[in-house]
């Protein structure tokens, strides 16, 4: 099996299937504008058993002044047999993480 991972250079950007809700959460909690991409998973890679399509998103944080980027917080990759399934799973898991992280940071910080 070949090593493969999705990248933004070979992906199509999408704003459907709940991505606008993810954009609202990112704006609310002061993250960079999310760019959700999806691509077709090649036949000869190990992750093909999870689905035909992969969607991915990198959560980036920045300060209020927009002059200093803190960089990558985490990234998400989900798979599905359709584009809508893959993107919907991604939006759900990313949204849950953003809310959990906000609650955890408020609890301890």
UniProtKB/Swiss-Prot annotation:
InterPro entries in the record: Corona_NS2 (IPR006841)
One Pfam family linked to the record: Corona_NS12-7
Similarity field: Belongs to the coronaviruses ns12.7 protein family.
Other information: Isolate N1 belongs to genotype A.
Protein name per the record: Non-structural protein 4
Organism: Human coronavirus HKU1 (isolate N1) (HCoV-HKU1)
């Amino acid at each position: 099996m070949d090593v493969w991972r999705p990248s933004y250079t070979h992906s199509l950007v999408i704003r459907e299937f709940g991505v606008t809700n993810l954009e609202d959460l990112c704006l609310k909690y002061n993250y960079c504008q999310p760019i959700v991409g999806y691509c077709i998973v090649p036949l000869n890679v190990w992750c093909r058993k999870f689905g035909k399509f992969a969607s991915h998103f990198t959560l980036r944080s920045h300060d209020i002044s927009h002059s200093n980027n803190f960089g990558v917080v985490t990234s998400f990759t989900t798979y599905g047999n359709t584009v809508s399934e893959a993107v919907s799973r991604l939006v759900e898991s990313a949204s849950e993480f953003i809310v959990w992280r906000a609650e955890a940071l408020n609890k301890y910080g």
